[in-house]
Design a protein with these regions (language model features):
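Short hydrophobic alpha-helices and adjacent helix-cap/hinge residues
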Residues: 1-227
Length: 227
């Protein structure tokens, strides 16, 4: 995105899955972008509180949660802050884990898993977290750590459960902005839109491999179940 804006300050740009367009310098504000770019943000940090609720539902004895995130980006720090806010109400202790290297991730997850009654929340998706997707999923499964991820890609790759913005819905809504711009409206005047539809996906194959029993009530609420 930044490279596109540097290439042209006049060609209209509609982005779809940007986490923090204001913090990233893409727009001046959510209400009035002010430049040649507008679009749809995935920055809905309250969803991470919901993620903790879902994780507690699938693992009611869980008392410790490892939060895997990149603290250097808004998506990582903001997501962790949202989880911190609700953690006391669920009676869980949080352990932040960085994503600087694969070795750091592996050492941290292995050490965390030793104490038992743990779970994992992955805060993202950010460019620094995504490259470690398969490693994180494999470690969580191997050490029987119930884990929740941020979008369907993770659950399709073997993650236990995912909850986050429906990216396909974001793309459909973006088409409306493209149409409005083609009809003469300016990106600078089109406010940044937040997610309105969220998707819950449960991977039953992974649940069985981990020995996790998914409550029927949770299965009934899932948008997709992978078997």
């Amino acid at each position: 995105m930044a490279a596109l804006q540097q290439a042209s300050r006049t060609v209209p740009i509609v982005f779809v899955t940007t986490i923090d367009p204001v913090g990233g310098g893409l727009v001046e504000s959510l209400a009035r972008p002010g430049g040649n770019a507008t679009g749809f943000s995935t920055r809905e940090f309250s969803m991470f509180g919901k993620s903790l609720e879902l994780l507690k539902e699938i693992a009611p004895r869980m008392s410790r949660v490892a939060v895997i995130r990149d603290p250097a980006v808004a998506g990582g720090s903001g997501g962790f802050a949202a989880i911190q806010t609700v953690a006391p109400s669920f009676g869980v202790e949080l352990t932040p884990i960085g994503v600087r290297t694969a070795d750091e991730i592996e050492r941290s997850i292995v050490a965390f898993a030793r104490s038992g009654n743990g779970g994992v929340i992955v805060v993202g998706p950010t460019s620094s977290v995504q490259p470690h997707r398969n490693l994180i999923i494999a470690l969580a499964t191997q050490h029987r750590l119930p884990a929740i991820y941020t979008n369907t890609i993770w659950s399709k790759a073997g993650g236990l459960i995912s909850y986050g913005p429906d990216n396909l819905d974001q793309y459909r809504r973006a088409a409306g902005y493209v149409d409005r711009i083609l009809r003469g409206e300016k990106p600078a005047d089109l406010p940044i839109q937040q997610p309105t539809k969220f998707e819950l996906v449960i991977n039953l194959k992974t649940a069985k491999a981990m020995g996790v029993t998914v409550p029927e009530a949770l299965l009934a609420r899932a948008d997709k179940v992978i078997e």
